[in-house]
Amino acid sequence: MAAKIRRDDEVIVLTGKDKGKRGKVKQVLSTGKVIVEGINLVKKHQKPVPALNQPGGIVEKEAAIQVSNVAIFNAATGKADRVGFRFEDGKKIRFFKSNSETIK
């Protein structure tokens, strides 16, 4: 099955502490989760790695969110939208269901 949310898509968070925030998808995990820039920030205690010249300390980084808790953002309507698939010129493309515009 094709992925409805892909890397570099702009998404909006539907539920949780970051509800309503928008961000760009950095990574889509095979476990049904996505990592979104600036969303679901957690503090991680990191040990120093002298070989890589990395200092230790408390680092803020993005944690994964369930893909069902985000929706693709439609810039034309300014709202969250659903994704559909159709074939054009023998290629499968994604489109917004609200206004039938192709995605990228």
Curated annotation (Swiss-Prot):
This is Large ribosomal subunit protein uL24. It comes from Photorhabdus laumondii subsp. laumondii (strain DSM 15139 / CIP 105565 / TT01). Part of the 50S ribosomal subunit. The keyword RNA-binding applies. SUPFAM superfamilies: Translation proteins SH3-like domain (SSF50104). One of two assembly initiator proteins, it binds directly to the 5'-end of the 23S rRNA, where it nucleates assembly of the 50S subunit. One of the proteins that surrounds the polypeptide exit tunnel on the outside of the subunit. The keyword rRNA-binding applies. One of its GO terms (molecular function) is rRNA binding. One of its GO terms (biological process) is translation. Keywords: Ribonucleoprotein, Ribosomal protein, RNA-binding, rRNA-binding. Pfam families: KOW, ribosomal_L24. Transmembrane segments: none annotated. Signal peptide: none annotated. CDD domains: KOW_RPL26. GO terms for cellular component: ribonucleoprotein complex; ribosome. InterPro entries: KOW (IPR005824), Rib_uL2_dom2 (IPR014722), Ribosomal_uL24 (IPR003256), Ribosomal_uL24_CS (IPR005825), Ribosomal_uL24_KOW (IPR041988), Translation_prot_SH3-like_sf (IPR008991). Belongs to the universal ribosomal protein uL24 family.
